UniProtKB/Swiss-Prot annotation:
It comes from Rattus norvegicus (Rat). This is Synaptotagmin-like protein 5. Binds RAB27A that has been activated by GTP-binding. May act as Rab effector protein and play a role in vesicle trafficking. Binds phospholipids. Residues 224-238 have a biased composition (Low complexity). The gene is Sytl5. Residues 145-188, 221-283, 298-359 are annotated as: Disordered. The keyword Lyase does not apply. Residues 429-550, 590-717 form the C2 domain. GO terms for molecular function: neurexin family protein binding; phospholipid binding; small GTPase binding; zinc ion binding. The modification Phosphoserine is found at residue 147. Transmembrane segments: none annotated. A zinc finger (FYVE-type) spans 64-106. SMART domains: C2 (SM00239).
Amino acid sequence: MSKNSEFINLSFLLDHEKEMILGVLKRDEYLKKVEDKRIRKLKNELLEAKRRSGKTHQEANRVCVHCQKSLGLIFDRGAPCQACSLRVCSECRVTGLDGSWKCTVCAKVAQLRIISGEWFLEEKAKRFKQVNVLGTDVVRQSILRRSPGSEEIQNQEQAHQGADKSDTLSSVRQKATHDGPKRKGFLLSKFRSATRGEIKTPKAESGRSYSLDLDNQNLQSFKSVSGSDRGSTTSSDLTDQEAGRGAPKGSCSNGGIPVTQRSPAPSARSVTSISSREHGFENSMALATIESISEELTKSHRRNTSGTPSIAVSGTSLSSERSRSELDLSESFAEDLEDTSSIRSRSVPGALDKDLNSLEDTEDGVDLVSSRFSANTHSLASGLSTSSQAGSDRKRSYLHVPDADSDTTSLNSMMSVYSETGDYGNVKVTGEILLHISYCYKTGGLYIFVKNCRNLAIGDEKKQRTDAYVKSYLLPDKTRNNKRKTKIRTGTNPEFNETLKYTISHTQLETRTLQLSVWHYDRFGRNSFLGEVEIAFDSWNFENPCDEWFVLQPKVELAPDISLQYKGELTIVLRYIPPEENLIFPVEQPQGKKIFKKGKKKESPAISGGILEVFIKEAKNLTAVKAGGTSDSFVKGYLLPDDNKATKHKTAVVKKSVNPQWNHVFIFSGLYPQDIQNACLELTIWDKEAFSSNIFLGGVRLNSGSGISHGKAVDWMDSRGEEQRLWQKMADNPGTSVEGVLMLRSSMAKCRL
């Protein structure tokens, strides 16, 4: 939609009419959340049913593919499903109104398609262009938008209240009206001088305290006043106002309202909380500025839909020379192992389930040392953590995040690998942490404002010293790209006043759990664990954010069950061409890799063996990792046990979409019929990052599921359910294309049976 058509003229409505409409929109938003939870529950049930299917071709199809019940020869023989043609018993059937029946899995798929409205969205996409703005959002924005006339009236009223405030607001509006074109050049020059360390952060005038509720009306009115001055407000402008806000237990904040305490309730890993909330957000002025900047960046990065899809083919002779930005982070940690899963197994997060011992403590120490060094030298250090205290220096990183985030967020360290695997120390956990959690629905920004801690344990008993910092993850993702950290603060009652930001859609956020842990930094030894708190967002109320105390809990070691985490779906088409039907010519070298020599041209050798064609069609509901709720995704494929880079296949990168369509063909040659039972097709989906390592989004493995390849036990022959069924169906029908929709794994570690 164009910028002009995003608002409707609703100035004729009265105030109470606007409130009634906003109330209806609020109820509509609540019902959408309830519906999203129900759809997510159905998806998890469907995923669990497919995982539970097990082996589908045992004893010549004489078992039910879903419940594994043995079928008889005469009685209780079972029948093939009319949708998927798999033989199921009488108990695994669902009868429709017209008398026809489907298996339980196909019935759940059809039910999910109807309830989620996927069929309607597909038909809508065929008839209309892609529309990113909902009608309810347009109405809400139109109501909350201030007209120029109302602004002038308010200016006159405020002029009688105080000369200082009216002068400030009028100057801001004057800049918004006349100096708009000059603002871009001013910000550019300010950024250049900031990188040289020439700008000194101004302090707030006379310690004034600005309190602004994170309500939509106040937030939008703040945007209309300071719309052109976005980006020029630094996070340190509010620091003097925020000094002394971390009130201890029993004291008051936010103008006399007592800060309530959350006592965590038992949970699976550690304990989270129930409480009463207070209203008001002291730091929402800075967040409003961030939100307005992120809004502009989101609009400027919208993707134009392309026309008809094209099909690309990659052969087995693709060059192994890749740019460093395409290589995965874990390839730099490759070891000389004789196992067939050497490089390939470390290119996916299967290592999340392995013991990495003291790697976490080491990388935490390196990150924090580099952040201290960068504060003095203005260098582009690894971890970017910008405090809201006065006088703190800005540090920028080359990570792929919007520029607006650099003033208010703590980004992950570039030197991190994986977390939470080492020794946690033997410090007795005590104390509490004060947090303010808010979410911006427009930009998809989750803001965790870490204020302070109190009554922490002593980290170093010998020196009687505590150097604390806070680290956060959005579970179950504990990769380095999902980590945020604060700066180090000294004492058992440290003041942080830092904002940790995540960009994530609200639907995805409801499936995540925030883990905040406090650590003692030891420069010459191991970092010590001081406590943690976990906050589940499935029922969190973001409408009225407030300051809350959380009691720190000890570490609880539980192996997370990540096999049922929904990461999206991948649609592929497989076809195996046996050697006797192979009429495909040798695949040419890619352009740019040809070597021209004088003399007689040599003929390319013919392809021996069979051909495996893998048509990568599309993916749906991928995890959004970029600002605006999108991803730049591509698919990478191996035919194990051959994991050489020369045989690696890649699709093109589809930008700014969580439902990409690749229409790309992978061709693997030299595959004989007897090799099918020993081979494994591994497909992984990655988010392309320009200046850092690619981010894993999910993957699948297709094989016989025997656990053995060429007489050796391997961990990658672990297919179950739909993955195993599709591979076996391809082997049983050579020359025929078979299509399947596969649930993506959240980790490429060996599947637990």
